[in-house]
Amino acid sequence: GDTLVSYSGSESTVTIPDGVRVIGENAFKNNDYILNVICPDSLEQIGYRAFYDCDNLQSVSLPETLKVINEGAFYYCENLKTLGHTDDGVLPKGLTSIGVKAFYFCKALEGDLVIPDGVTSLSAGLFYNGFALTSITIPDTVTSMDANGDQFANCTAVTSVKLSKNLTELPK
């Protein structure tokens, strides 16, 4: 089918086959072998905690077609450095939804974070402990931020932030 349900292999580089639209819930959870994941252009959604605690994961090439990154998708991927979009900011332009703590404790994720125009709300704990992020751009399409906050807590290398002019309230 069009959903990758589970991967339990020990390859260091995993190429997800073309035609896969969804990476399922917990599909790669706790896999310490994978270093790189190459996603197909057909990919539209990454499931709940799909890459949870993949300690050695360093890069994931996310296609521009990706629409949804669910809750905790890359939670505790402490060595994740790149999502394959270094020219256009960290995230694919097609994204419309990023779940709670999607990139929680991705402390190696580098560069200038640009939230895509399709996103309207920022979930709690989104880039918590994003120590290597250097700037954050939040487009005017974002009108709310989860009141539980910590979207960018401890992003200590950030030197520049551009906020949406349509945000009426920031979390505490």
Which residues does each PLM region occupy?
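Consensus positions within tandem repeat domains that build extended binding/scaffold surfaces
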Residues: 25-27, 47-52, 70-75, 99-104, ...
